Amino acid sequence: MNDETTPANKNPEKAELRCGWTTGACATAATKAALTALITGEFPDPVGIILPKGEVPYFQLAYEGLGEGYAMAGIVKDAGDDPDVTHGATIISTVYPAPPGTGIIFRAGEGVGTVTREGLAIPPGEAAINPVPRRMMTEICEAICAEYGLPADLVITISVPGGEEIAQKTWNPRLGIIGGISILGTTGVVHPFSCSAWIHSIHRGIDVARAAGQKHVLGATGSTSEDAAQALYNLPDFAILDMGDFAGGVLKYLREHPIDRLTIAGGFAKLTKLAQGALDLHSSRSQVDKGFLWQIAERAGAPADMKERILLANTAMEVLELTQSIGIDIAGPIALEARQTALKTLRGAPVEVEIIVTDRKGNILARV
């Protein structure tokens, strides 16, 4: 087996950034170490596992505990150069025998959440340990038990000290996962600044809202626009999608999994990009087109001598302020164009779309 202590970064534009490991990979390695110690009395350190795509990382143990009828092992999560809130958290697995014929049971220990709402991959009442980490732990436990001629009847409790506090920085409270973080991962590898985890959470948020029968959801580009929309609707937490810059992540998923009504709320600059047709609103992946803003302003009645000032403006907000200074409304037309982009992306899905444009203070500039 190859000793791969750091996952390869296959994105040449981010070759200098270091990848890391998911909580699911850490939990699997900790479980392997704990079960091995439970059977043999010895902890493998480092402990290697095989990830779904064949990588073979080795993990140093940060914690070992062996008692009467149980074993515990802990690994400090290394997320590489990704700004992951779980980076540095200790993932602890406690393993002990279960009654004959029970199979493998997963439990949430300190700092690991419990699912309370329908719509997620794990049913309510279960530990928030996602399917792939469950499968990885199950397969490795079954293989170890088979090697020693033992039945794989085990209780695996995953704990993360401080996880309840960490979870407040995640989507878990809105998804109805209480008490801590989730044990996640589909490949075992964390890619720095990957969009996939964020978009996955948006999808799970839509799933939860649909399962709850919610007919109206809100996607906002930030907290200011979210607060402005919530002042109008006071939607339940699980109806608020953490859209951020990923308008496309919301709209494309709703295309296949519709909800009756979607409100998109955002600042003027972000929604100008949506009006232009951009679905990723991040500043590094889409830019405001001043020529587009001039066309909007011209149609709204802006005089010709304003064209150069708009084209040379530093920001979208500067353009907005210029037009406001002469009583020209461009926020309304931007909202209409943004709505057209959303409807085009939905491709006829039965979703009613509302757009709310706000300024930096949260004042509503347009609502269509």
UniProtKB/Swiss-Prot annotation:
Q: Name one GO biological process term.
A: anaerobic cobalamin biosynthetic process
Protein name per its UniProtKB record: Cobalt-precorrin-5B C(1)-methyltransferase
Which biological pathway? Cofactor biosynthesis; adenosylcobalamin biosynthesis; cob(II)yrinate a,c-diamide from sirohydrochlorin (anaerobic route): step 6/10
The protein's GO terms of the molecular function aspect are: cobalt-precorrin-5B C1-methyltransferase activity
Its EC number is 2.1.1.195
Q: Which InterPro entries match?
A: CbiD, CbiD_sf
Report which reactions are catalysed by this protein.
Answer: Co-precorrin-5B + S-adenosyl-L-methionine = Co-precorrin-6A + S-adenosyl-L-homocysteine
Alphabetically list the UniProt keywords. Cobalamin biosynthesis, Methyltransferase, S-adenosyl-L-methionine, Transferase
The answer, when asked if Methyltransferase is one of the entry's keywords, is: yes
Gene3D superfamilies attached to this UniProt entry: CbiD-like
Q: Which family does it belong to?
A: Belongs to the CbiD family.
